[in-house]
A protein has these predicted regions:
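PLP-dependent amino-acid enzyme catalytic core
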Residues: 3-6, 13-15, 20-520
Protein backbone atom coordinates (compact mmCIF):
# COMPACT_ATOMS: atom_id res chain seq x y z
CA UNK A 1 0.00 0.00 0.00
CA UNK A 2 1.26 3.46 -0.79
CA UNK A 3 1.94 5.25 2.45
CA UNK A 4 -0.23 8.36 2.91
CA UNK A 5 1.26 11.72 3.74
CA UNK A 6 1.88 12.59 7.37
CA UNK A 7 -0.58 14.73 9.26
CA UNK A 8 0.06 16.79 12.36
CA UNK A 9 0.45 14.78 15.52
CA UNK A 10 2.13 11.89 13.73
CA UNK A 11 -1.07 10.37 12.35
CA UNK A 12 -1.47 9.81 8.66
CA UNK A 13 -4.74 9.84 6.79
CA UNK A 14 -5.82 7.44 4.05
CA UNK A 15 -8.21 8.88 1.48
CA UNK A 16 -9.56 5.56 0.18
CA UNK A 17 -13.31 5.05 0.02
CA UNK A 18 -14.92 3.31 2.95
CA UNK A 19 -17.09 1.27 0.61
CA UNK A 20 -14.15 -0.49 -1.06
CA UNK A 21 -12.20 -3.38 0.42
CA UNK A 22 -8.47 -3.44 -0.15
CA UNK A 23 -5.48 -5.11 1.43
CA UNK A 24 -4.29 -1.78 2.75
CA UNK A 25 -5.10 -1.38 6.43
CA UNK A 26 -2.47 -2.88 8.72
CA UNK A 27 -1.93 -2.33 12.45
CA UNK A 28 1.37 -1.79 14.20
CA UNK A 29 2.59 -1.87 17.78
CA UNK A 30 3.22 1.38 19.62
CA UNK A 31 6.48 -0.14 20.91
CA UNK A 32 7.69 -1.70 17.67
CA UNK A 33 6.55 -0.01 14.46
CA UNK A 34 8.03 -2.88 12.48
CA UNK A 35 5.47 -5.28 13.96
CA UNK A 36 2.54 -5.12 11.53
CA UNK A 37 -0.57 -7.30 11.56
CA UNK A 38 -4.03 -7.36 9.99
CA UNK A 39 -7.06 -6.04 11.84
CA UNK A 40 -8.19 -9.62 12.50
CA UNK A 41 -4.85 -10.43 14.13
CA UNK A 42 -4.88 -7.21 16.16
CA UNK A 43 -8.36 -7.97 17.49
CA UNK A 44 -7.56 -11.61 18.25
CA UNK A 45 -4.28 -10.85 20.04
CA UNK A 46 -5.59 -7.82 21.92
CA UNK A 47 -2.09 -6.62 22.81
CA UNK A 48 1.23 -6.92 21.02
CA UNK A 49 3.76 -9.45 22.31
CA UNK A 50 6.14 -6.56 23.08
CA UNK A 51 3.58 -5.00 25.43
CA UNK A 52 2.59 -2.28 22.97
CA UNK A 53 -0.90 -1.45 21.75
CA UNK A 54 -2.04 -1.90 18.18
CA UNK A 55 -2.86 1.22 16.16
CA UNK A 56 -3.81 1.57 12.48
CA UNK A 57 -0.98 2.38 10.08
CA UNK A 58 -3.08 5.26 8.82
CA UNK A 59 -6.45 6.82 9.58
CA UNK A 60 -9.14 6.65 6.90
CA UNK A 61 -10.39 10.09 5.92
CA UNK A 62 -13.96 11.35 6.08
CA UNK A 63 -14.58 14.09 3.56
CA UNK A 64 -17.35 16.69 3.99
CA UNK A 65 -19.28 14.75 1.35
CA UNK A 66 -18.87 11.56 3.41
CA UNK A 67 -20.21 13.31 6.50
CA UNK A 68 -23.20 14.66 4.57
CA UNK A 69 -23.94 11.16 3.28
CA UNK A 70 -23.62 9.64 6.76
CA UNK A 71 -26.13 12.18 8.07
CA UNK A 72 -28.76 10.46 5.94
CA UNK A 73 -28.10 7.02 7.45
CA UNK A 74 -29.10 5.29 10.68
CA UNK A 75 -26.63 4.23 13.37
CA UNK A 76 -26.03 0.69 12.10
CA UNK A 77 -25.31 1.88 8.57
CA UNK A 78 -22.94 4.55 9.85
CA UNK A 79 -21.16 1.85 11.86
CA UNK A 80 -20.94 -0.36 8.77
CA UNK A 81 -19.34 2.48 6.83
CA UNK A 82 -16.74 3.20 9.53
CA UNK A 83 -15.84 -0.45 10.13
CA UNK A 84 -15.44 -1.00 6.39
CA UNK A 85 -12.68 1.59 6.46
CA UNK A 86 -10.77 0.03 9.37
CA UNK A 87 -11.35 -3.71 8.89
CA UNK A 88 -10.17 -4.15 5.33
CA UNK A 89 -9.43 -7.87 5.73
CA UNK A 90 -13.08 -8.56 6.67
CA UNK A 91 -15.62 -9.23 3.93
CA UNK A 92 -18.61 -6.89 3.54
CA UNK A 93 -20.84 -9.76 4.66
CA UNK A 94 -18.83 -10.30 7.84
CA UNK A 95 -18.98 -6.63 8.78
CA UNK A 96 -22.71 -6.47 8.06
CA UNK A 97 -23.31 -9.54 10.23
CA UNK A 98 -21.30 -8.07 13.13
CA UNK A 99 -23.04 -4.70 12.92
CA UNK A 100 -26.57 -6.06 12.60
CA UNK A 101 -26.00 -8.57 15.42
CA UNK A 102 -24.97 -5.76 17.77
CA UNK A 103 -26.94 -2.63 16.95
CA UNK A 104 -30.58 -3.68 16.99
CA UNK A 105 -33.73 -3.26 19.08
CA UNK A 106 -33.07 -6.51 20.95
CA UNK A 107 -29.92 -5.07 22.50
CA UNK A 108 -30.76 -1.36 22.70
CA UNK A 109 -33.94 0.27 23.95
CA UNK A 110 -33.60 3.15 21.49
CA UNK A 111 -33.63 2.58 17.74
CA UNK A 112 -31.13 5.42 17.51
CA UNK A 113 -28.78 3.30 19.71
CA UNK A 114 -27.24 6.49 21.16
CA UNK A 115 -29.58 9.29 22.25
CA UNK A 116 -28.64 12.92 21.66
CA UNK A 117 -30.48 15.29 24.02
CA UNK A 118 -30.41 19.10 23.66
CA UNK A 119 -29.94 20.57 27.13
CA UNK A 120 -29.34 24.31 26.81
CA UNK A 121 -27.45 27.00 24.85
CA UNK A 122 -25.98 24.71 22.19
CA UNK A 123 -25.08 22.07 24.77
CA UNK A 124 -26.06 18.45 24.13
CA UNK A 125 -25.96 15.24 26.14
CA UNK A 126 -24.90 12.10 24.28
CA UNK A 127 -26.52 9.21 26.17
CA UNK A 128 -24.54 6.04 25.55
CA UNK A 129 -26.28 3.90 28.16
CA UNK A 130 -29.38 2.51 26.47
CA UNK A 131 -27.89 -0.95 26.00
CA UNK A 132 -28.32 -4.14 28.05
CA UNK A 133 -26.04 -3.15 30.96
CA UNK A 134 -26.95 0.56 31.11
CA UNK A 135 -23.42 1.84 30.45
CA UNK A 136 -21.47 3.18 27.48
CA UNK A 137 -19.36 0.03 27.35
CA UNK A 138 -22.29 -1.71 25.62
CA UNK A 139 -21.64 0.41 22.54
CA UNK A 140 -18.43 -1.55 21.96
CA UNK A 141 -18.99 -4.77 23.86
CA UNK A 142 -22.13 -5.75 22.00
CA UNK A 143 -20.13 -5.91 18.77
CA UNK A 144 -16.70 -7.02 20.05
CA UNK A 145 -17.66 -10.71 20.48
CA UNK A 146 -18.77 -10.83 16.84
CA UNK A 147 -15.63 -9.05 15.65
CA UNK A 148 -13.47 -11.34 17.77
CA UNK A 149 -15.06 -14.58 16.59
CA UNK A 150 -14.79 -13.50 12.95
CA UNK A 151 -11.14 -12.58 13.57
CA UNK A 152 -10.32 -15.81 15.40
CA UNK A 153 -11.93 -17.90 12.68
CA UNK A 154 -9.56 -16.31 10.20
CA UNK A 155 -6.36 -16.18 12.28
CA UNK A 156 -6.49 -19.02 14.84
CA UNK A 157 -9.10 -21.54 13.67
CA UNK A 158 -9.94 -24.18 16.26
CA UNK A 159 -8.54 -22.22 19.21
CA UNK A 160 -10.64 -21.48 22.29
CA UNK A 161 -10.45 -17.76 23.07
CA UNK A 162 -9.95 -16.88 26.74
CA UNK A 163 -11.07 -13.32 27.49
CA UNK A 164 -9.43 -11.65 30.50
CA UNK A 165 -10.91 -8.38 31.74
CA UNK A 166 -9.90 -5.91 34.42
CA UNK A 167 -12.78 -3.63 35.30
CA UNK A 168 -13.47 -0.54 37.35
CA UNK A 169 -17.15 -1.40 37.11
CA UNK A 170 -18.87 -1.04 33.76
CA UNK A 171 -16.56 -2.92 31.38
CA UNK A 172 -16.86 -6.12 33.40
CA UNK A 173 -20.62 -6.45 33.20
CA UNK A 174 -20.77 -5.30 29.58
CA UNK A 175 -18.09 -7.84 28.59
CA UNK A 176 -19.82 -10.64 30.51
CA UNK A 177 -23.11 -9.83 28.84
CA UNK A 178 -21.52 -9.63 25.40
CA UNK A 179 -19.58 -12.90 25.66
CA UNK A 180 -21.96 -15.06 27.69
CA UNK A 181 -22.52 -18.41 25.99
CA UNK A 182 -20.60 -17.36 22.86
CA UNK A 183 -19.25 -20.67 21.48
CA UNK A 184 -15.49 -21.07 21.57
CA UNK A 185 -14.92 -18.48 24.30
CA UNK A 186 -14.46 -18.22 28.06
CA UNK A 187 -14.38 -14.97 29.98
CA UNK A 188 -12.93 -14.11 33.40
CA UNK A 189 -13.44 -10.67 34.94
CA UNK A 190 -11.36 -9.23 37.79
CA UNK A 191 -12.68 -6.23 39.73
CA UNK A 192 -11.47 -4.29 42.82
CA UNK A 193 -13.41 -5.61 45.80
CA UNK A 194 -14.16 -2.17 47.26
CA UNK A 195 -13.83 -0.16 44.06
CA UNK A 196 -17.19 -0.61 42.30
CA UNK A 197 -20.72 0.49 43.17
CA UNK A 198 -23.09 -2.00 44.86
CA UNK A 199 -25.15 -2.13 41.66
CA UNK A 200 -22.10 -2.78 39.50
CA UNK A 201 -20.99 -5.57 41.84
CA UNK A 202 -24.44 -7.11 41.82
CA UNK A 203 -24.55 -7.01 38.02
CA UNK A 204 -21.31 -8.97 37.77
CA UNK A 205 -21.70 -11.47 40.60
CA UNK A 206 -25.14 -12.59 39.39
CA UNK A 207 -24.10 -12.97 35.75
CA UNK A 208 -25.56 -15.96 33.96
CA UNK A 209 -23.82 -17.95 31.25
CA UNK A 210 -21.92 -21.25 31.21
CA UNK A 211 -18.61 -19.74 30.07
CA UNK A 212 -18.27 -16.83 32.52
CA UNK A 213 -16.39 -16.28 35.80
CA UNK A 214 -15.93 -13.27 38.07
CA UNK A 215 -13.37 -12.68 40.83
CA UNK A 216 -12.74 -9.76 43.18
CA UNK A 217 -9.22 -8.71 44.09
CA UNK A 218 -8.00 -7.01 47.24
CA UNK A 219 -6.66 -3.89 45.56
CA UNK A 220 -7.71 -1.13 43.18
CA UNK A 221 -8.40 -1.08 39.45
CA UNK A 222 -4.79 -0.33 38.58
CA UNK A 223 -3.78 -3.50 40.43
CA UNK A 224 -6.32 -5.48 38.42
CA UNK A 225 -5.27 -3.94 35.10
CA UNK A 226 -1.55 -4.43 35.82
CA UNK A 227 -2.21 -8.05 36.77
CA UNK A 228 -4.11 -8.76 33.56
CA UNK A 229 -1.38 -7.14 31.44
CA UNK A 230 1.25 -9.23 33.23
CA UNK A 231 -0.70 -12.42 32.50
CA UNK A 232 -1.10 -11.41 28.85
CA UNK A 233 2.63 -10.93 28.33
CA UNK A 234 3.77 -14.07 30.21
CA UNK A 235 5.31 -16.14 27.41
CA UNK A 236 5.47 -19.33 29.48
CA UNK A 237 1.78 -19.09 30.30
CA UNK A 238 0.97 -18.37 26.65
CA UNK A 239 2.81 -21.55 25.69
CA UNK A 240 0.76 -23.58 28.19
CA UNK A 241 -2.42 -22.18 26.68
CA UNK A 242 -1.21 -22.93 23.17
CA UNK A 243 -0.61 -26.56 24.15
CA UNK A 244 -4.25 -26.69 25.28
CA UNK A 245 -5.48 -25.03 22.05
CA UNK A 246 -6.34 -21.83 23.91
CA UNK A 247 -5.41 -18.20 23.33
CA UNK A 248 -5.72 -15.11 25.52
CA UNK A 249 -7.49 -12.04 24.23
CA UNK A 250 -8.76 -8.84 25.79
CA UNK A 251 -12.12 -7.10 26.04
CA UNK A 252 -10.56 -4.02 27.62
CA UNK A 253 -10.02 -0.90 25.55
CA UNK A 254 -6.42 -1.95 24.94
CA UNK A 255 -8.04 -4.13 22.23
CA UNK A 256 -8.55 -2.26 18.96
CA UNK A 257 -11.86 -4.11 18.59
CA UNK A 258 -13.08 -2.14 21.61
CA UNK A 259 -11.80 1.21 20.44
CA UNK A 260 -13.04 1.17 16.84
CA UNK A 261 -16.74 0.99 17.87
CA UNK A 262 -16.19 4.02 20.09
CA UNK A 263 -14.93 6.03 17.13
CA UNK A 264 -18.23 5.21 15.44
CA UNK A 265 -20.40 7.04 17.95
CA UNK A 266 -18.46 10.28 17.68
CA UNK A 267 -18.78 10.22 13.90
CA UNK A 268 -22.45 9.31 14.22
CA UNK A 269 -23.07 12.10 16.72
CA UNK A 270 -21.77 14.77 14.37
CA UNK A 271 -23.78 13.26 11.53
CA UNK A 272 -26.87 13.39 13.75
CA UNK A 273 -26.28 17.05 14.60
CA UNK A 274 -26.07 17.81 10.88
CA UNK A 275 -29.17 15.73 10.16
CA UNK A 276 -31.15 17.58 12.83
CA UNK A 277 -30.03 20.98 11.61
CA UNK A 278 -28.22 21.73 14.88
CA UNK A 279 -24.96 22.41 13.02
CA UNK A 280 -24.04 22.94 9.40
CA UNK A 281 -21.54 20.53 7.88
CA UNK A 282 -18.09 21.82 8.82
CA UNK A 283 -19.16 23.76 11.91
CA UNK A 284 -16.89 22.91 14.88
CA UNK A 285 -18.07 21.28 18.09
CA UNK A 286 -16.39 20.57 21.42
CA UNK A 287 -16.60 17.18 23.12
CA UNK A 288 -16.50 16.64 26.90
CA UNK A 289 -15.61 13.14 28.06
CA UNK A 290 -15.45 11.77 31.61
CA UNK A 291 -12.62 9.25 31.44
CA UNK A 292 -10.12 7.31 33.52
CA UNK A 293 -8.47 4.89 31.11
CA UNK A 294 -8.49 7.47 28.29
CA UNK A 295 -10.09 5.17 25.70
CA UNK A 296 -13.35 7.10 25.35
CA UNK A 297 -11.69 10.44 24.66
CA UNK A 298 -9.02 8.82 22.49
CA UNK A 299 -11.81 7.59 20.22
CA UNK A 300 -12.97 11.21 19.89
CA UNK A 301 -9.40 12.23 19.03
CA UNK A 302 -9.27 9.62 16.27
CA UNK A 303 -12.68 10.76 14.94
CA UNK A 304 -11.34 14.32 14.84
CA UNK A 305 -8.28 13.28 12.86
CA UNK A 306 -10.46 11.36 10.42
CA UNK A 307 -12.30 14.57 9.61
CA UNK A 308 -14.99 15.20 12.22
CA UNK A 309 -14.68 18.94 13.01
CA UNK A 310 -14.05 18.65 16.74
CA UNK A 311 -12.39 21.77 18.13
CA UNK A 312 -11.52 21.06 21.77
CA UNK A 313 -11.34 17.69 23.49
CA UNK A 314 -12.24 18.31 27.13
CA UNK A 315 -10.97 15.57 29.46
CA UNK A 316 -12.93 15.35 32.72
CA UNK A 317 -11.47 13.57 35.77
CA UNK A 318 -12.50 13.02 39.37
CA UNK A 319 -10.17 13.42 42.36
CA UNK A 320 -7.84 10.87 40.75
CA UNK A 321 -6.70 13.69 38.50
CA UNK A 322 -3.54 12.25 36.98
CA UNK A 323 -4.82 13.03 33.47
CA UNK A 324 -5.64 16.64 34.34
CA UNK A 325 -2.12 17.17 35.63
CA UNK A 326 -0.63 15.47 32.60
CA UNK A 327 -2.53 17.59 30.09
CA UNK A 328 -1.58 20.75 31.96
CA UNK A 329 2.09 19.96 32.65
CA UNK A 330 3.23 17.11 30.41
CA UNK A 331 4.26 15.15 33.51
CA UNK A 332 2.53 11.82 34.15
CA UNK A 333 2.99 10.80 37.78
CA UNK A 334 1.03 8.00 39.40
CA UNK A 335 2.95 8.39 42.66
CA UNK A 336 0.03 9.99 44.45
CA UNK A 337 -2.86 9.17 46.74
CA UNK A 338 -5.58 6.95 45.30
CA UNK A 339 -9.13 8.04 46.06
CA UNK A 340 -12.28 5.93 46.12
CA UNK A 341 -14.93 8.27 44.75
CA UNK A 342 -18.63 8.37 43.85
CA UNK A 343 -17.53 7.99 40.20
CA UNK A 344 -15.69 4.66 40.61
CA UNK A 345 -15.31 3.82 36.92
CA UNK A 346 -12.80 6.69 36.77
CA UNK A 347 -10.84 5.70 39.87
CA UNK A 348 -7.73 5.00 37.83
CA UNK A 349 -4.12 6.20 38.03
CA UNK A 350 -2.66 4.26 35.07
CA UNK A 351 -4.42 5.28 31.86
CA UNK A 352 -3.54 2.60 29.32
CA UNK A 353 -4.85 4.26 26.18
CA UNK A 354 -2.69 7.33 26.69
CA UNK A 355 0.05 5.28 25.05
CA UNK A 356 -1.80 5.35 21.74
CA UNK A 357 -2.24 9.13 21.90
CA UNK A 358 1.42 9.73 22.70
CA UNK A 359 2.47 7.46 19.86
CA UNK A 360 0.57 9.76 17.51
CA UNK A 361 1.76 13.00 19.10
CA UNK A 362 5.46 12.05 19.07
CA UNK A 363 5.46 11.19 15.38
CA UNK A 364 5.10 7.44 15.92
CA UNK A 365 8.50 7.22 17.61
CA UNK A 366 8.33 3.78 19.20
CA UNK A 367 11.66 4.29 20.99
CA UNK A 368 10.27 7.29 22.86
CA UNK A 369 7.14 5.33 23.77
CA UNK A 370 9.22 2.44 25.11
CA UNK A 371 11.32 4.90 27.12
CA UNK A 372 8.35 6.76 28.63
CA UNK A 373 6.37 3.69 29.54
CA UNK A 374 9.45 1.88 30.76
CA UNK A 375 9.97 4.82 33.09
CA UNK A 376 6.33 4.63 34.19
CA UNK A 377 6.79 0.96 35.05
CA UNK A 378 10.04 1.53 36.95
CA UNK A 379 9.52 4.90 38.65
CA UNK A 380 5.81 5.63 38.28
CA UNK A 381 6.34 8.78 36.23
CA UNK A 382 7.56 10.23 32.95
CA UNK A 383 7.69 13.65 31.31
CA UNK A 384 7.04 14.17 27.62
CA UNK A 385 9.06 16.50 25.43
CA UNK A 386 8.14 20.12 24.74
CA UNK A 387 6.81 19.40 21.25
CA UNK A 388 4.37 16.83 22.65
CA UNK A 389 3.34 19.19 25.47
CA UNK A 390 2.47 21.83 22.88
CA UNK A 391 0.34 19.40 20.87
CA UNK A 392 -1.45 18.25 24.03
CA UNK A 393 -2.30 21.82 24.99
CA UNK A 394 -3.53 22.61 21.48
CA UNK A 395 -6.01 19.74 21.34
CA UNK A 396 -6.99 18.99 24.93
CA UNK A 397 -8.27 20.74 28.04
CA UNK A 398 -8.02 18.88 31.34
CA UNK A 399 -10.14 19.50 34.41
CA UNK A 400 -11.33 17.65 37.51
CA UNK A 401 -13.76 17.89 40.40
CA UNK A 402 -14.25 16.26 43.80
CA UNK A 403 -17.24 14.32 45.12
CA UNK A 404 -19.01 17.34 46.61
CA UNK A 405 -18.75 19.20 43.31
CA UNK A 406 -19.97 16.10 41.48
CA UNK A 407 -23.09 15.87 43.63
CA UNK A 408 -23.69 19.61 43.30
CA UNK A 409 -23.58 19.23 39.51
CA UNK A 410 -26.17 16.43 39.66
CA UNK A 411 -28.43 18.62 41.78
CA UNK A 412 -28.01 21.64 39.51
CA UNK A 413 -28.81 19.64 36.37
CA UNK A 414 -31.90 18.20 38.02
CA UNK A 415 -33.14 21.51 39.42
CA UNK A 416 -32.44 23.66 36.35
CA UNK A 417 -33.19 21.29 33.49
CA UNK A 418 -35.11 18.37 35.07
CA UNK A 419 -32.30 16.18 33.76
CA UNK A 420 -31.02 13.34 35.94
CA UNK A 421 -27.45 12.26 35.31
CA UNK A 422 -25.08 9.78 36.92
CA UNK A 423 -21.95 10.66 38.85
CA UNK A 424 -19.50 10.26 35.94
CA UNK A 425 -21.59 12.41 33.64
CA UNK A 426 -21.79 15.00 36.42
CA UNK A 427 -17.99 15.18 36.51
CA UNK A 428 -18.09 16.08 32.82
CA UNK A 429 -20.81 18.69 33.44
CA UNK A 430 -18.75 20.39 36.17
CA UNK A 431 -15.52 20.37 34.18
CA UNK A 432 -17.32 21.80 31.16
CA UNK A 433 -18.72 24.61 33.32
CA UNK A 434 -15.18 25.36 34.48
CA UNK A 435 -13.87 25.28 30.91
CA UNK A 436 -16.56 27.62 29.64
CA UNK A 437 -16.06 30.07 32.51
CA UNK A 438 -12.28 29.99 32.06
CA UNK A 439 -12.22 30.37 28.26
CA UNK A 440 -15.50 32.04 27.31
CA UNK A 441 -15.77 29.46 24.50
CA UNK A 442 -19.40 29.18 23.31
CA UNK A 443 -18.78 26.56 20.60
CA UNK A 444 -21.60 24.02 20.49
CA UNK A 445 -20.64 21.18 22.80
CA UNK A 446 -21.49 17.51 23.29
CA UNK A 447 -21.16 16.10 26.83
CA UNK A 448 -20.76 12.33 26.88
CA UNK A 449 -23.10 10.61 29.35
CA UNK A 450 -21.61 7.24 30.20
CA UNK A 451 -24.08 5.48 32.51
CA UNK A 452 -27.67 5.39 33.67
CA UNK A 453 -28.12 7.35 36.92
CA UNK A 454 -29.65 4.19 38.39
CA UNK A 455 -26.28 2.42 38.32
CA UNK A 456 -25.16 4.82 41.06
CA UNK A 457 -28.52 5.25 42.74
CA UNK A 458 -27.40 6.07 46.28
CA UNK A 459 -25.05 8.88 45.24
CA UNK A 460 -27.55 10.34 42.77
CA UNK A 461 -30.41 10.15 45.25
CA UNK A 462 -28.33 11.86 47.92
CA UNK A 463 -27.34 14.55 45.42
CA UNK A 464 -30.94 15.53 44.65
CA UNK A 465 -31.87 15.62 48.33
CA UNK A 466 -33.46 12.22 48.71
CA UNK A 467 -33.27 9.99 51.77
CA UNK A 468 -30.56 7.37 51.36
CA UNK A 469 -31.97 4.43 53.29
CA UNK A 470 -32.83 0.79 52.68
CA UNK A 471 -31.11 -1.42 50.12
CA UNK A 472 -30.13 -0.35 46.63
CA UNK A 473 -33.42 -1.55 45.17
CA UNK A 474 -35.48 0.55 47.54
CA UNK A 475 -33.31 3.50 46.59
CA UNK A 476 -34.03 2.82 42.92
CA UNK A 477 -37.75 3.04 43.66
CA UNK A 478 -37.25 6.26 45.61
CA UNK A 479 -35.17 7.75 42.82
CA UNK A 480 -37.85 6.76 40.33
CA UNK A 481 -40.58 8.45 42.35
CA UNK A 482 -38.48 11.61 42.71
CA UNK A 483 -37.38 11.85 39.08
CA UNK A 484 -40.02 10.08 37.03
CA UNK A 485 -37.24 8.40 35.03
CA UNK A 486 -38.07 4.70 34.49
CA UNK A 487 -35.83 2.16 36.23
CA UNK A 488 -34.11 -0.01 33.58
CA UNK A 489 -35.43 -3.56 33.76
CA UNK A 490 -31.87 -4.88 33.59
CA UNK A 491 -31.21 -3.28 37.00
CA UNK A 492 -34.59 -3.80 38.65
CA UNK A 493 -34.44 -7.52 37.87
CA UNK A 494 -31.16 -8.01 39.75
CA UNK A 495 -32.95 -8.15 43.08
CA UNK A 496 -34.15 -11.70 42.55
CA UNK A 497 -31.04 -13.08 40.83
CA UNK A 498 -28.79 -15.35 42.94
CA UNK A 499 -25.13 -14.48 43.51
CA UNK A 500 -22.95 -16.93 41.57
CA UNK A 501 -19.47 -15.49 42.13
CA UNK A 502 -18.22 -14.51 45.58
CA UNK A 503 -14.49 -15.30 45.32
CA UNK A 504 -11.99 -12.66 46.45
CA UNK A 505 -8.20 -13.06 46.22
CA UNK A 506 -4.98 -11.14 46.74
CA UNK A 507 -3.73 -9.43 43.59
CA UNK A 508 -0.72 -11.76 43.51
CA UNK A 509 -3.10 -14.73 43.10
CA UNK A 510 -4.69 -13.60 39.83
CA UNK A 511 -2.68 -15.99 37.67
CA UNK A 512 -3.56 -18.89 39.97
CA UNK A 513 -7.25 -18.08 39.48
CA UNK A 514 -6.79 -18.12 35.71
CA UNK A 515 -4.95 -21.45 35.77
CA UNK A 516 -7.60 -23.02 37.98
CA UNK A 517 -10.43 -21.79 35.78
CA UNK A 518 -8.78 -23.22 32.67
CA UNK A 519 -7.77 -26.48 34.32
CA UNK A 520 -4.08 -25.92 33.61
Amino acid sequence: MKRPARRRGGLSKDHSSGGEWSSGMLYKSTRNSGCKVTSAAAITQGISADGGLFVPESLPALSPADMTRLAGLGYADRAYDVFSRFLTDFTPEEIRHCVDSAYNDRNFESDRIAELVHLYDGTYMLELWHGPTCAFKDMALQILPHLLMASAKRTVPGKEIVILVATSGDTGKAALEGFKDVPGTRILVFYPEDGVSPMQKRQMTTQDGANVAVCAIKGNFDDAQTGVKRIFTDSALAARLADADMLFSSANSINWGRLAPQIVYYISTYAELVKNGEVRQGDPINVVVPTGNFGNILAAYYAKHMGVPIAKLICASNANNVLTDFIRTGVYDRNRSFYTTVSPSMDILISSNLERLLYALCGEDDARIADWFGSLSKTGRYEVTDDVKAKLAAEFYGGFCDDDQTKAAIRAMFDKYSYLCDTHTAVAVKVYEDYRRETGDTTKTVIVSTASPYKFGASVLEAIGGSVSGDEYEMLDTLNSRSGLPVPEALAGLKTKPVRFAQSVEKQQMQDVVLHLLGL
